[in-house]
Amino acid sequence: MNRRAVVLGSAGQLGAELVRELRARGYSAIGWDRDEVDITDAAAVENAIARFDAEVVFNAAAYNQVDVAEEEPQAAFEVNALAVRNIALACRQTDARLVHFSTDYVFDGWARHPYAEDDPTHPLGAYAVSKLAGELYAQAYLDRVLIVRTSGLFGPRGLATARGNFVELMLRLAVSGQPIRVVEDHVASPTFAPLLAARTIDLADREAWGLFHIGGGAPISWFQFARTIFEVAGLKPMLLATSEREYRTRARRPKYSALSNAKMERVGLDPMPPVRQALEGYFAERSRAVSGTPA
């Protein structure tokens, strides 16, 4: 009998990859987005999960408008925290396992080494607070829960909902012909969505419960990441380095939020590849996704 899995937020970059990877591994996987299951409705969530008789639920749904969340924190909290409580309670009632995704933004960025899972959290804005609250709800209600923090997600599928994808933003700006300014004093671990999906399912299959970090390869500044994007894409726009002081945003963001994958590797998973290799994979997958060619 096939294992049965539900993916919430299946229209997004990560959700689309989870559905694809689960099915490739022989799971009977179904994906639901907000139009199909309202995760802020506790009864609707429990009924849907029970009806499908899911063994494992992957929650890739999130409110991720970091700056807008400063103006509407309740909306962020409803999706990133209260809805996670709904999902966790539904999993407890149906005896399903939960895999939930969180963010590097739970840290304040004062570290100068990749963050480990046991480093203290200190979220700086409404979005980050809501994501940390979601982690706490999941841990409070479930023993068999896997929480995966990631950073700077970029994925070729779900492009209709991926306007926040940094790679696509850079490509759009390159076409404009205008100078492109990117901060060089913020460092993260940009993460290729198909690899994140695969490593996460590996952890779930091993029943590696608890908190794990899965980020891209070596830490990289957003300016360096943009430069690598253009090199891999064969583009030569005018790219200029700027700083946080010159490029103000409504929400505060951690200046350093690179994630350590050491715990993931200790349980036997392969290291994440360098960012250039991940970008080469991105553009190859992107071409297939845009053309409709199967992977």
Task: Describe the function of each predicted region.
Residues 3-22:
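N-terminal Rossmann NAD(P)H-binding glycine-rich loop of SDR-like oxidoreductase domains
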Residues 8, 32, 60-61, 98-103, ...:
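SDR active-site strand-loop-helix element
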Residues 23-47:
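Adenosine-cofactor binding site in Rossmann-like domains, unifying the SAM/SAH pocket
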Residues 42-79, 90-92:
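NAD(P)H-binding glycine-rich loop region in Rossmannoid oxidoreductase-like domains
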Residues 71, 78, 82-86, 106-148, ...:
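Catalytic helix-loop patch of NAD(P)-dependent Rossmann-fold dehydrogenases
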Residues 136-188, 194-195, 202:
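NAD(P)-dependent short-chain dehydrogenase/reductase
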Residues 199, 206-250, 255, 283-286, ...:
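Mid/C-terminal beta-alpha module of Rossmann-like enzyme folds, strongest
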Residues 255-295:
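C-terminal amphipathic/interface module of NAD(P)-dependent oxidoreductases
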